[in-house]
């Protein structure tokens, strides 16, 4: 079976994660896909395939003869999708021989256009897969799952000698909780790759340092007709706080290795207001400066409006895995060589986000990220090509071959 055929099946399984439930997994939907994958793994001959109580799927592929004592290599992808644009099941749409031009997404009124996504012109002649424009597609990261499954099927012909291989599919990656209950010992790998990137040939081992900031504002609410020198409008103080951050340090205005503050939630009135941010930077020193700048603004506003007006809570989320991967760069060398042998230019890019692999690397499992061939994740313009998925499978198999050469 081709990777894209598996993808078409997986995206029809509804698996959004949720930040609201506080459970693990965050949604029971994810078990629907997990059970399907366990069955497929068993049919492919994967040993010990099962799903645990937290919705982690594990399986193992025994080494070929003579390679039993070699290091164990793993491959990981996640089952959940974002909850945005995911209020009803996905309807995938296949466009053969895409012409590289504007493409209407069903009857949604949305148009996938090279004006918005310039890389589309390079996909001319390929078979494009999208949603109908009313939902995400779900290639993030069901394409990664489909590609790993296809790699497993290809390995069954025994033409690639390999050591013990470890497979895992995780829940709740999109809400940053993918590794929360990941059993490193049960998984068993010495090294692994996540298949959770964008274009085929992409190799990523640098991600953001990440934190979340919640800023609370306590106001003083009195009748506006008699409030001179008394009222403290929490909503206005919140606006003042945000105005003191660098105006160009936002996701819209940054790229590559540039960090940002992202204000993603505003709630409030005169009495109380809340701003919620994520703080991101690849450089650890710059990351610390960003956090300290928020602390400084909090201090300044409390001096101006009164002690306790502003309270700041910063929660660390994940760190840049580069410091771990730097100690085992052979993982990147194998991936780079694999791309070249598959006639694909390796594209080493920083991750402007995080992956399960970032956290797993600090848990003792070095885990860079590979591209799946997908684009425009987390929205209705998400798309992938059949050919890109085939290349991602080819690169993954070549990595296995080179790792055990």
Provide a role label for each language-model segment:
Residues 2-28, 129-130, 318, 378-379:
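N-terminal capping segment at the start of a domain
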Residues 22-70, 74-76, 80, 91:
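A non-catalytic alpha/beta surface segment that caps or lines the substrate-entry region
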Residues 28, 135-146, 228-236, 383-390:
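Short, conserved micro-motifs enriched in small and acidic residues
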Residues 67-161, 169:
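Active-site metal-coordination/substrate-binding segment of hydrolases
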Residues 112, 126-139, 171-295, 299, ...:
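Midchain, well-structured core segments that form catalytic/ion-binding scaffolds
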Residues 153-166, 247-254, 405:
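Phosphate-handling active-site elements
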Residues 235-405:
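Metal-dependent amide/peptide-bond hydrolase catalytic core
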């Amino acid at each position: 079976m081709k990777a894209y055929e598996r993808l078409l099946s997986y995206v029809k399984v509804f698996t959004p994660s949720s930040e609201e439930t506080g459970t693990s997994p965050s949604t029971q939907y994810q078990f629907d896909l997990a059970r399907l994958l366990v069955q497929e793994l068993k049919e492919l001959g994967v040993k010990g395939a099962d799903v645990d109580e937290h919705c982690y799927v594990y399986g193992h592929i025994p080494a070929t003869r003579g390679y039993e004592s070699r290091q164990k290599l793993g491959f990981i992808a996640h089952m959940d999708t974002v909850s945005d644009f995911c209020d009803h099941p996905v309807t995938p749409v296949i466009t053969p021989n895409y012409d590289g031009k504007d493409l209407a997404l069903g009857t949604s009124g949305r148009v996938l256009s090279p004006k918005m996504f310039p890389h589309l012109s390079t996909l001319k002649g390929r078979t494009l897969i999208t949603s109908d424009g009313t939902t995400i597609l779900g290639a993030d990261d069901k394409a990664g799952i489909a590609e790993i499954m296809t790699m497993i099927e290809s390995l069954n012909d025994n033409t690639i000698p390999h050591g013990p291989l470890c497979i895992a599919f995780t829940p709740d990656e999109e809400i940053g909780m993918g590794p929360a209950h990941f059993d490193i010992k049960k998984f068993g790998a010495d090294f692994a790759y996540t298949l959770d990137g964008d274009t085929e040939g992409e190799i990523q081992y640098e991600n953001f340092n990440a934190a979340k900031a919640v800023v609370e504002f306590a106001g003083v609410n009195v009748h506006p007709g008699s409030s001179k020198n008394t009222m403290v409008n929490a909503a206005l103080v919140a606006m003042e706080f945000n105005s003191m951050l660098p105006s160009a340090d936002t996701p819209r205005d940054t790229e590559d290795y540039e960090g940002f503050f992202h204000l993603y939630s505003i709630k409030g009135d005169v009495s109380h207001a809340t701003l919620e941010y994520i703080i991101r930077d690849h450089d650890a020193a710059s990351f610390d400066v960003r956090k300290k700048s928020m602390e400084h603004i909090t201090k300044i506003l409390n001096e101006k409006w009164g002690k306790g007006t502003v309270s700041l809570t910063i929660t660390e989320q994940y760190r840049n895995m580069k410091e771990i991967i730097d100690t085992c760069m052979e993982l990147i060398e194998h991936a780079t060589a694999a791309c070249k042998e598959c006639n694909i230019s390796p594209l080493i890019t920083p991750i402007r986000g995080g992956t399960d692999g970032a956290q797993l690397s600090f848990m003792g499992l070095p885990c860079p990220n590979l591209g799946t061939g997908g684009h425009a994740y987390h929205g209705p313009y998400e798309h992938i090509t059949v050919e890109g998925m085939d290349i991602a499978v080819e690169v993954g198999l070549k990595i296995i071959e080179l790792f055990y050469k």
